[in-house]
Amino acid sequence: MWKQKLMRKAILYGIVLLLILWPLYSLKQMLTHRGESHDANHLLFQVSVFQMEVLKNYLDEAPQSKSTHDLDAVKQALYSASYTHERLVLAAGGSEELTGLSFMDHLSQFVQRMQLGGTRALKPDEIQTLKETRDQYDKMYDIYEKLMASNGDIVSSQNAKLAELDGDLAAFLRKKGLQ
């Protein structure tokens, strides 16, 4: 008889304990929701790196282009990479946390200016500008890959290097656009 009472009490205490611990566990999970945000930012970073790699591949091919029409792929890759990076900047907390990439606007304008007159052969100085842009962008891409730490934070030293290289490339393209 006393074993039966002890068993009922144990079951009752087990149910009460379960009813107390289960909501506490749910509350803990809800409050530590930050992990998913980190995961989303890290996934967005991976997409952005992929878009930057696509742009790098098209910039590698750009100096071999014969005509302005061949630069359409560069223009598309620029748009995609720029769009993705802008979203990453917003997700990372704004331009105070992650630098924007102004060279993309200047490169896009440079390509559009070349294509303005329709399809034509590229001039030697335009090909040289594409080669120099490719070389400078390769350095930027190497930095960009290391921009986010494994915990989802922006690495400030890499961000500073990226900002410097972006400024140099933007100034170079601005100068070429004025010639």
Please state what every model-predicted region is.
Residues 17-20, 55, 81:
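Hydrophobic alpha-helical transmembrane segments of multipass integral membrane proteins
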Residues 121-179:
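C-terminal amphipathic alpha-helix
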Residues 1-7:
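Short, Lys/Arg-rich N-terminal segment immediately upstream of the first membrane anchor
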Residues 59-118, 155-169, 174-175:
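Alpha-helical segments in soluble extracytoplasmic regions
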Residues 8-28:
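Hydrophobic membrane-insertion alpha-helices, especially the h-region
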Residues 29-75:
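Immediate post-signal-peptide N-terminus of mature secreted/exported proteins
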Residues 39-46, 94-100, 129:
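A ubiquitous short alpha-helical element
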Residues 49-66, 108-119, 131-152:
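Regular secondary-structure segments
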